[in-house]
């Protein structure tokens, strides 16, 4: 029963429309325009260790990564790019610093894109025309990757620090060099370790060009700190419609970068939701170890890809109500758990059987969603 309190119904919050951007291709992945926002990561292996690099790319792909970047600091790394690009399941971006010759090798190797840093590639500007020709011939896109830690000295002298304005000027100057040869297949990033400066830089850049933007907070830090910085910065910009591809930079396993990136997009309804675990923060009313139970449920359901929301609640006081919007859940207490679907209790099980029963029901619901797109609630 719905009680009318005489209060106006607030509108459902929505994000700003996506910024209209020029669309490019990174391998077979569309970036910009009306393409979905892609999630990127970067390998941590020595690229010339082909086996280790491809193994990590496979793990990233399995986690949902759309595009992967590999470092190319040496001749040995450049020489194996054809193998990496050919065997990778997802498009490869070669990350080039200091040596323009590696740009050409990466293009010829079949990389989906090449990242260049205008702050540190010596004698780069006078080779732009040749790079444009090679990139056009091979269908390779470019990422102009400006980084606060390697900004051109001239801009540091002008602005006194790697400000948002300095990074934007660097990016637009580099873009103009490509534009003079009619080349527009590039995306831009202006990364800073401070989310506030980073946000300001992307907002300024978005107002001055229509190129797709790659979002990133550089040197974000360990997993906990980096996740917060990236979520704050990306959430702000994506809510404004700014951003076409993202990379969460963490001092952690790159697979964690992908997981965080996907969850950020899912949280903003910018990517179809997969499995979601919601759980209460625990309090003095709890009669079960919510932290352990939530972690056990999360681990047990890890292989399920269906868009299920599963709630783990620590008591029956608010558990059923708070978990009503979940597809499946449990409100635990007094050594047992009330299992519910869409707010309706379907079974009460002993505490020791909660995880097993949730896994069983979640798998059944996932199977039904695969075949019918809907699930049936059965009470027993």
UniProtKB/Swiss-Prot annotation:
Co-factor binding details: Binds 1 [4Fe-4S] cluster.
Annotated pathway: Isoprenoid biosynthesis; isopentenyl diphosphate biosynthesis via DXP pathway; isopentenyl diphosphate from 1-deoxy-D-xylulose 5-phosphate: step 5/6
Gene3D superfamilies in the record: Dihydropteroate synthase-like, Sulfite Reductase Hemoprotein, domain 1
Record GO terms (molecular function): 4 iron, 4 sulfur cluster binding; 4-hydroxy-3-methylbut-2-en-1-yl diphosphate synthase activity (ferredoxin); 4-hydroxy-3-methylbut-2-enyl-diphosphate synthase activity (flavodoxin); iron ion binding
Enzymatic reactions: (2E)-4-hydroxy-3-methylbut-2-enyl diphosphate + oxidized [flavodoxin] + H2O + 2 H(+) = 2-C-methyl-D-erythritol 2,4-cyclic diphosphate + reduced [flavodoxin]
EC numbers for this chain: 1.17.7.3
Top EC group: oxidoreductase
A GO BP entry: isopentenyl diphosphate biosynthetic process, methylerythritol 4-phosphate pathway
Keywords: 4Fe-4S, Iron, Iron-sulfur, Isoprene biosynthesis, Metal-binding, Oxidoreductase
Coiled coil: none
Residues given in the record as [4Fe-4S] cluster binding sites: 280, 283, 315, 322
Cofactor(s) required, per the database record: [4Fe-4S] cluster
Function: Converts 2C-methyl-D-erythritol 2,4-cyclodiphosphate (ME-2,4cPP) into 1-hydroxy-2-methyl-2-(E)-butenyl 4-diphosphate.
Family affiliation: Belongs to the IspG family.
Protein name: 4-hydroxy-3-methylbut-2-en-1-yl diphosphate synthase (flavodoxin)
Species of origin: Cutibacterium acnes (strain DSM 16379 / KPA171202)
């Amino acid at each position: 029963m719905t009680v009318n309190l005489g209060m106006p119904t607030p509108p459902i919050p929505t994000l700003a429309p996506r910024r209209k951007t020029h669309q490019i291709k990174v391998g077979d992945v569309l970036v910009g325009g009306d393409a979905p926002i892609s999630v990127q990561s970067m390998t941590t292996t020595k690229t010339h260790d082909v086996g280790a690099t491809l193994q990590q790319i496979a793990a990233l792909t399995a986690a949902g990564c759309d595009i992967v970047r590999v470092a190319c600091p040496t001749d040995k790394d450049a020489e194996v790019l054809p193998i990496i690009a050919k065997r990778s399941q997802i498009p490869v971006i070669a990350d080039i610093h200091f040596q323009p010759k590696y740009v050409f090798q990466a293009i010829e190797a079949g990389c989906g894109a090449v990242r260049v840093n205008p702050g540190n590639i010596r004698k780069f500007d006078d080779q732009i025309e040749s790079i444009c020709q090679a990139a056009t011939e091979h269908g390779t896109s470019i990422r102009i990757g400006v980084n606060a830690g390697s900004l051109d000295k001239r801009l540091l002298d002008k602005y006194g620090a790697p400000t948002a304005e300095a990074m934007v000027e660097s990016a637009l100057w580099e873009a103009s060099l490509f534009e003079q040869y009619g080349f527009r297949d590039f995306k831009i990033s202006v990364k800073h370790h401070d989310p506030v400066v980073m946000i300001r830089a992307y907002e300024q850049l978005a107002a001055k060009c229509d190129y797709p933007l790659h979002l990133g907070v550089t040197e974000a830090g360990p997993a906990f700190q980096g996740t917060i910085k990236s979520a704050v910065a990306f959430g702000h910009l994506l809510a404004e419609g700014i951003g076409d591809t993202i990379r969460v930079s963490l001092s952690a396993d790159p697979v964690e970068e992908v997981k965080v990136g996907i969850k950020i997009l899912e949280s903003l309804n910018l990517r179809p939701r997969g499995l979601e675990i919601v759980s209460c923060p625990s309090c003095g009313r709890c009669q079960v170890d919510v932290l352990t139970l939530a972690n056990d449920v999360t681990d047990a359901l890890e292989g399920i890809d269906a868009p299920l929301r599963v709630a783990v609640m620590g008591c029956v006081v608010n558990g059923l109500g708070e978990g009503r919007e979940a597809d499946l859940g449990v409100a635990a207490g007094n050594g047992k758990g009330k299992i519910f679907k869409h707010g309706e209790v379907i079974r009460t099980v002993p505490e020791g059987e909660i995880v097993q029963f949730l896994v069983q029901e979640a798998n059944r619901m996932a199977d039904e969603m695969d075949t019918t797109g809907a699930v049936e609630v059965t009470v027993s």
